[in-house]
Amino acid sequence: MKKDELIFKLIEQENNRQCEGIELIASENFVSPQVLKAAGSILTNKYAEGYPRKRYYGGCQIVDEIEQTAIDRLKHLFHAEWVNVQPHSGAQANMTVFLACLQPGDYFLGLGLSHGGHLSHGSPVNFSGLSYKALEYGTEKENGKINYQQLEYVAMEKIPKLIIAGASAYSRDWDYQRIRLIADKIGAIFMVDMAHPAGLIAAQLLDNPLHYAHIVTSTTHKTLRGPRGGIILMGKDFENPWGRTTTKGKIKMMSEILDSALFPGVQGGPLEHIIAAKAIAFYEALQPEYVVYQKQVKKNAQVMAKALNSTGYKIVSGGTDNHLMLVDLRSKFPTLSGKQAEVALVSADITVNKNMVPFDNRSPFLTSGLRFGTPAITTRGAKEPLMEEIVELIDTVLSNVDNDKIVSSVKKKVNILMKDYPLFAW
């Protein structure tokens, strides 16, 4: 078979881009060589519809062991009674929960997209907003933190069947217990999407939502530092509250409903090569050095937020408890959009993403904010002093977005700087 020169050339170019630049996108990270090896392994050849020891295909005895290992490790990592490691993505994990818990047209409540929420928590262009009636809560205008009073008011007024906590651009920990109490008042299922802070939660640096939520979903990349994929977890399994029964009349456990909602409800065959890579990532997350890594992620984020703040940038919520921060550019550069800022920084090989901020007066295509995160740069071995240096480089670019010469000089500094940092340091 003739080698596909074009695609491998592009892969090499992407490798160079990742190595030469500063990666600050909060949802990105660099996986270990062994995770990468498993994700590209011969396991991609195997079809395995169903679950371990309950497959619709023969020859699954080895992938059964692999998937069961991933299940056991994930349970141990988050102290879960039940997990499912098959979701192809976080969005499909969320879709599974919706299918299991809601009927089309039912109300559910999630954090608004412009306040840091995720597409799959009720965006009108997403399955969640198209098939179900989305209600939203937001953050407080004064301090940028979750408006729990608004959340409770909407919940008590509309009685949603599902309440979602979790975000894609929120830098503080959550009061899961408070939301669970609200959910219990109205008989709602409480789901937490911990996709962003999952690694910090695994390292016990943030509150574990499995102690409070009925159901938890996550991605396996981001802070968890595994392959791209999703997971669903429960701290404790329970009888479904709707009285759904088996053909023999026994009330189904929630785990049974979630399993069947994922397969055959949302997906067909699982990606066993990715499940193997997930298993390795869970193994890595159970090692002592992983906790050290996550502590550094958090320290780096706090130093970066402090440096940005002292340079005149406004951090939404005033700081960070996790791995990310949302910067409102309007306080320092009123006429600079998030899109313009992103383009300028990417030109200097500093990769970030534009992001809406609470009460934004710009469209989602322009935005007034930038989101920064430290998981990827920390994986490369970066520590606190480099965070301060990076903020200086960011400020130089954003103060000179129309000056190609200055942006180019920053790019050269970035490329020289990153030569000392391997893609995966620990």
Swiss-Prot record:
UniProt-recorded name of the protein: Serine hydroxymethyltransferase
Marked site (Plays an important role in substrate specificity) residue numbers: 221
A single cellular component GO annotation: cytosol
Residues the record lists as binding (6S)-5,6,7,8-tetrahydrofolate: 113, 117-119, 363-365
An annotated Gene Ontology molecular function: pyridoxal phosphate binding
Family (UniProt): Belongs to the SHMT family.
Location in the cell: Cytoplasm
Source organism per UniProt: Azobacteroides pseudotrichonymphae genomovar. CFP2
Cofactor: pyridoxal 5'-phosphate
This protein's UniProt keywords: Amino-acid biosynthesis, Cytoplasm, One-carbon metabolism, Pyridoxal phosphate, Transferase
Pathway the protein takes part in: One-carbon metabolism; tetrahydrofolate interconversion; Amino-acid biosynthesis; glycine biosynthesis; glycine from L-serine: step 1/1
EC number: 2.1.2.1
PROSITE patterns: SHMT (PS00096)
Modified residues (N6-(pyridoxal phosphate)lysine): 222
Lineage of the organism: Bacteria, Pseudomonadati, Bacteroidota, Bacteroidia, Bacteroidales
Role this protein plays: Catalyzes the reversible interconversion of serine and glycine with tetrahydrofolate (THF) serving as the one-carbon carrier. This reaction serves as the major source of one-carbon groups required for the biosynthesis of purines, thymidylate, methionine, and other important biomolecules. Also exhibits THF-independent aldolase activity toward beta-hydroxyamino acids, producing glycine and aldehydes, via a retro-aldol mechanism.
GO biological process: glycine biosynthetic process from serine; tetrahydrofolate interconversion
Gene3D superfamilies from the UniProt entry: Aspartate Aminotransferase, domain 1, Type I PLP-dependent aspartate aminotransferase-like (Major domain)
Keyword hit for Cytoplasm: yes
Catalytic activity: (6R)-5,10-methylene-5,6,7,8-tetrahydrofolate + glycine + H2O = (6S)-5,6,7,8-tetrahydrofolate + L-serine
Pfam families, per database record: SHMT (PF00464)
Subunit and partners: Homodimer.
